[in-house]
């Protein structure tokens, strides 16, 4: 049974990775959180405390460390210092510490399509990472590319455990009683649900996937179409109004040839089913499940 250590286990991606992998009952899981324990026995870590990080790695000796820690767009705008340390520097620190303290282990790090400007779309490995904002540039610098570790470049949507999430999914549900919301028809997306990311991580562990990999279903969808699909899947009463909005296309071409990402409708229905089975986690969304 492989041992997996999940950093940032209380976040949007981290909690889903934990609960999905736990449901498979084939891993011994350890979780690391910033302030509040996810499971009652999580390690609590200030990421500036490298001594505690070393102790956690030495004590658990995980086969895989999944890094779900990150400063998002708003946080990056608020604190460039935090964005540089957490998004750019910390993934490389983790990779270095793993090599020094854990035998035969690897890092799985989550990157973003926001390393691209969104001026072109259908981005591949050959395209220049041309983002000019703090978030995009720091995530660019944080991509760990070597012969041992794995960086998954993607974009995610999914539920939050906290009340003040900033993702698109949480924004929609937080405003579900509004009469109407704007959906951007000129903003193109090609990401996955957090549940699908968790499934991909299971695949990556099983197949020992390494290097830099891009994750998508190779299908483009506008933010307007995506919001419409979410409202239909979760039976939300709000009307989505089509507006041009922000012009951006950060769609990426998937590179994981042996793994098939399903359609958006299937991903969202799978997410709905997962959330319905785990209502205790998602009390703020409960009426929609």
Language model segments and positions:
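NAD(P)-dependent short-chain dehydrogenase/reductase
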Residues: 132, 144-189, 195-196
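NAD(P)-cofactor binding segment of oxidoreductase domains
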Residues: 59, 78-108
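Adenosine-cofactor binding site in Rossmann-like domains, unifying the SAM/SAH pocket
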Residues: 31-52
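NAD(P)H-binding glycine-rich loop region in Rossmannoid oxidoreductase-like domains
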Residues: 45-86
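Mid/C-terminal beta-alpha module of Rossmann-like enzyme folds, strongest
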Residues: 198-249, 280-287
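Amphipathic terminal alpha-helices
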Residues: 263-289
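Catalytic helix-loop patch of NAD(P)-dependent Rossmann-fold dehydrogenases
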Residues: 85, 89, 114-152, 156-162
């Amino acid at each position: 049974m492989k041992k997996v250590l999940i950093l940032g286990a209380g976040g949007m991606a981290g909690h889903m990775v934990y609960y999905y992998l736990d449901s498979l009952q084939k891993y011994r899981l350890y979780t690391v959180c910033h302030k509040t324990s996810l499971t009652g026995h999580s390690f609590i870590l200030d990421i500036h405390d490298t001594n505690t990080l070393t102790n956690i790695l030495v004590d658990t000796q995980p086969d895989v460390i999944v890094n779900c820690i990150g400063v998002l767009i708003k946080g990056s705008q608020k604190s460039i210092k935090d964005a540089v340390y957490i998004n750019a520097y910390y993934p490389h620190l983790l990779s270095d510490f793993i090599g020094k303290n854990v035998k035969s282990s690897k890092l799985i790090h989550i990157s973003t399509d926001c390393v691209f400007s969104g001026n072109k779309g259908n981005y591949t490995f050959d395209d220049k990472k041309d983002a000019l904002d703090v978030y995009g540039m720091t995530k660019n610098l944080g991509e760990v590319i070597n012969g041992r570790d794995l960086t998954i470049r993607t974009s995610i949507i999914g539920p939050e455990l906290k009340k003040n999430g900033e993702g698109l999914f949480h924004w929609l549900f937080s405003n579900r009683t509004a009469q109407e919301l704007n959906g951007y028809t000129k903003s193109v997306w090609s990401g996955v649900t957090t549940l699908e990311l968790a499934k991909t991580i299971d695949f990556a562990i099983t197949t020992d996937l390494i290097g830099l990999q891009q994750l998508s279903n190779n299908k483009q969808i506008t933010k307007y179409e995506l919001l419409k699909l979410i409202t239909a899947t979760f039976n939300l009463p709000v009307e989505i109004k089509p507006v041009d909005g922000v012009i951006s296309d950060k769609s990426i071409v998937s590179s994981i040839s042996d793994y098939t990402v399903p359609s958006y409708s299937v991903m969202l229905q799978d997410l709905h089913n997962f959330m319905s089975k785990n209502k205790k986690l998602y009390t703020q969304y409960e009426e929609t499940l």
